[in-house]
Amino acid sequence: MGVFRYDPAAKKLGELIASNPRYDMGAAANGSRVAGVLTNAKDNKIVGYRVAGLKPETIWIDEQYAKTQAALDSTLKDRTNLFSRTPDGKALVVNSFSDQAPPRWYLFDEEKRTLEEIAASKPWLDGKLPEQHPFFFKARDGLELTGYYFLPKGAKPGDKFPTIVHIHGGPHARADSWGSGFGVSEARILATRGYAVVLPNFRITPGFGSKAYYSGFGTYGKQMLDDHEDALKWAVGEGFVDSSRVCISGASYGGYASLQMLARAPGLFKCAIAGLAPTDMEYQLTTLEGDTARSEPGVKIWKSILGTEDLGSQAVKDVSPLFNASKIKGAVFMYAGRDDIRVPIAQMYKIERALTSAGNPPVAFVVKEKEGHGFGKLENNLDLYTQILKFLDDQLKPKS
């Protein structure tokens, strides 16, 4: 993946300015911006590029900016230091953070060579967050994929932990990055309570090259799910997983995958946490109660992800948890927002009834009023995670 000069008159690519063999630059394969072209505020000249890999990286082509980066990195050690120039061009705003420390913002005066802290996010957490480990793994078809894992503080080689495989939403979205993201936040909560957590960037996750992205199309409920299992297999091979105590979790697509994996790989996971989950893909893409069916481009891309134009086909039923409820073995925890217009709550009630009819009613189904596709109120999130932790403790019983 690279950034080239472009001649608009000749409509031709020119010289290669910067490249990365693994990560997208400028924009991901799905068109979303994953990394920025950096320009000088004074003259709009291109001075560098930002690569959003497993850890963010800045490639400077301007020598002075490269020297400034080196100076900041030597002062703010063991942190990722991203900076941009103020609109008046007189100073730099620095965003400094790490996997174990929330962001702090500084103002760097180049002329005076002074660095002044101007804001901090949750400074009481500095150094107290669990370490975020990037990893690479190969899917069963040979596709190289990436992810992160977290271990409880004080973990030693040979220690085995109850483990949560957290699946991000989308699925065609980059949900987690270095030090931030819904999955990263959940992993931090769980790791501080004695759990190991694995966050796979499965096929169709943008930002990791066109092959990894486009390999996901047509594999919904199939190879995409294989990747979740293969990430767990990698983690088991690393030696930190207690294979008898593994749960799968996620929201939106991640909630879908959590339910479908219990049906697809019985015995692999003891339990599932499924939030905001589409459970009937035909309903999801046709009901006007939700916003997806109202978007022609949205339905079109979803048909390509499913690999079929026929939403009423048996193939779509086969990858819908609602029609596999009798195969779902293991304890299920569900949650939803009453006002969700992305995944209408009716689907969650459908799977609740289907699981109950199959003799495996959800252990808990948390519904919050005036919440949508994700909970925004602090009190609702506190209650949700209090209940999730109790559920996991009951199912997996961590030693500490």
Predicted regions and their residues:
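The start of beta-strands in P-loop NTPase/AAA+ ATPase cores
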Residues: 161-163, 331
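Histidine-centered divalent metal-coordination motifs
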Residues: 146, 168, 373
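Peripheral, non-catalytic segments that deliver or gate enzyme domains
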Residues: 1-146, 150-160, 171-182, 186-193, ...
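Hydrophobic beta-strand anchors of alpha/beta hydrolase catalytic cores
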Residues: 164-166, 197
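Short beta-strand segments enriched for Tyr within beta-sheet-rich domains
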Residues: 161, 195, 269-270
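The conserved beta1-alpha1 loop
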Residues: 167-169, 336
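Acidic helix/loop microenvironments that form the catalytic cleft of cell-wall polysaccharide enzymes
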Residues: 169-171, 253-254
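Active-site-proximal cap/loop segments of hydrolase catalytic domains
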Residues: 184, 189, 199-400
